[in-house]
Amino acid sequence: CKRRDIMKLIEVHSPNLNLLLPAPFDLIELPVRMEVGYEEIANDVRKAASVLVGEIMTKKVRTTKKDASISDAAALMDKHNVNRLPVVDENNKLVL
């Protein structure tokens, strides 16, 4: 299994999806400081591809407003142990 084969498995075809979805490597939690064989990574990507969104989605989504400070947003993320914080408007609609 080659590096380009792995990249083909995780390729996202729509740039707009990157605004809403975590990076593929975030899903498989690729160890940065360990050497992992490409075949093992490819197997992890294949497994991740078979998981349904509903199985891993956050049930209670934490949000912030666009006028919130970075420090307030970071504190909210830390408090609720989340690494994504969608920004919503006054009608709770996603700000793009």
UniProtKB/Swiss-Prot annotation:
InterPro entries: CBS_dom, CBS_dom_sf, Diverse_CBS-Domain
Key words of the record: CBS domain
Signal peptide: none
One Pfam family in the UniProt entry: CBS
Gene3D superfamilies listed in its UniProt record: CBS-domain
Residue ranges annotated for the CBS domain, each copy included: 57-96
This protein's name: Uncharacterized protein in nifH2 5'region
UniProt lineage: Archaea, Methanobacteriati, Methanobacteriota, Methanomada group, Methanobacteria
